[in-house]
Amino acid sequence: MKEPAFWRTDGGRGSGALARALLAPLGWIHAWAVARRIRKATPVRIGPKVVCVGNLTVGGTGKTPVTQTLMQRLAEMDLTAASLSRGYGGREAGPLRIDPATHDASTVGDEPLLLARTGQAWIARDRAAGGRAIEAAGGVDLVLMDDGHQNPDLAKDCSIVVVDGLTGWGPGTIVPAGPLREPVATGLARADAVIVMMPDAATEPDWTGLGLSDLSIPVFHAWLEPLAPPPAGKLVAFAGIGRPEKFFDALRAAGGDIGEVAVYGDHHAFNAGDLRHLDALAAAHDAQLITTEKDWVRLPVDIQARVTAWPVRAVFANPGALDGLLRDVMDADMDAGGEAG
């Protein structure tokens, strides 16, 4: 789905304030349901440490690239990590270890398939069952739970909240009145660290505006950095992610010559009609098609060869502090039960 326009406005006449007000009671019910589920749950504790990379809003904040970077840094520390995702958009319920050679996005989801390119990746709609399956398979020091800050089923040793530094928490209203999954104060109270994703290294986060200046937990500044420059020549860029404009802006900032863009809903399943439309746009502009890695893995295999995937990675202003957080997680004594973060 595409985000309603009123999710990303600051209020005022004509900005969706009426829609938010009308939907606010449903948001309160949603927040109550989330809080009740967390309060009533008995989290399952597994042997490997569990670090959750989640957020407080619906839509793209950069969780998957952050998870990839964490997997890489853990590997550099001689630790074996496995990612655990719900598998949104895929048919398989799991628990299932992903094999990129045999699975595709329609079976396991796009984000888990992307994570499987970095390291061991699993899906499980039942996160506790997924954690047990990873533990039973053996050889894993730490599980990176991709999304799940509001899922209490698997006990966490560290909960990291990722937030888009430009859009922040939106207008502060809860789904369906806004992008929040739960109240900000409630979500941050369960967090052990926050990662603020900015457009680049030079753009400093508004710590005060985001309500992060007085937090007693680590707060990191990070951004997405392309692994290669955009292709030369005219481009037609398309994306079906939470915040497609971030992809288009990054392409332009890197020097990409975009003739036209095409926007699809998050996790969109591309069909023959979409591909004909994209081919027509490319022909009209004498351009090359380019998309995100996450979108590229959802394309039919016979189409992938003629579409460029533009990979990015999450880069941290203070990677040493990030490594320190991960070491602290590994060094911490395991509590007898319950949830650390």
Curated annotation (Swiss-Prot):
The answer on whether this UniProt entry bears the keyword Ribosomal protein reads no
Q: Which InterPro entries match?
A: LpxK, P-loop_NTPase
Q: In which pathway does it act?
A: Glycolipid biosynthesis; lipid IV(A) biosynthesis; lipid IV(A) from (3R)-3-hydroxytetradecanoyl-[acyl-carrier-protein] and UDP-N-acetyl-alpha-D-glucosamine: step 6/6
- Its transmembrane ranges are none
Broadest EC class assigned to this enzyme: transferase
EC number(s): the record gives: 2.7.1.130
Under the GO molecular function aspect, what terms does this record hold?
A: ATP binding; tetraacyldisaccharide 4'-kinase activity
Q: Which UniProt keywords apply?
A: ATP-binding, Kinase, Lipid A biosynthesis, Lipid biosynthesis, Lipid metabolism, Nucleotide-binding, Transferase
- GO terms for CC? plasma membrane
Keyword tRNA-binding included in the entry's annotation: no
| Residues noted as binding ATP in the record, renumbered to the chain | T57, V58, G59, G60, T61, G62, K63, T64
What Pfam families does the record point to?
LpxK
Chemical reaction(s) catalysed: a lipid A disaccharide + ATP = a lipid IVA + ADP + H(+)
Q: Which GO terms describe its biological process?
A: lipid A biosynthetic process; lipopolysaccharide core region biosynthetic process
- Name the job this protein performs: Transfers the gamma-phosphate of ATP to the 4'-position of a tetraacyldisaccharide 1-phosphate intermediate (termed DS-1-P) to form tetraacyldisaccharide 1,4'-bis-phosphate (lipid IVA).
Q: Which family does it belong to?
A: Belongs to the LpxK family.
Against PANTHER family, the record matches this protein to: TETRAACYLDISACCHARIDE 4'-KINASE, TETRAACYLDISACCHARIDE 4'-KINASE, MITOCHONDRIAL-RELATED
What is this protein's record name?
Answer: Tetraacyldisaccharide 4'-kinase
**Which species is the source of this protein?**
Maricaulis maris (strain MCS10) (Caulobacter maris)
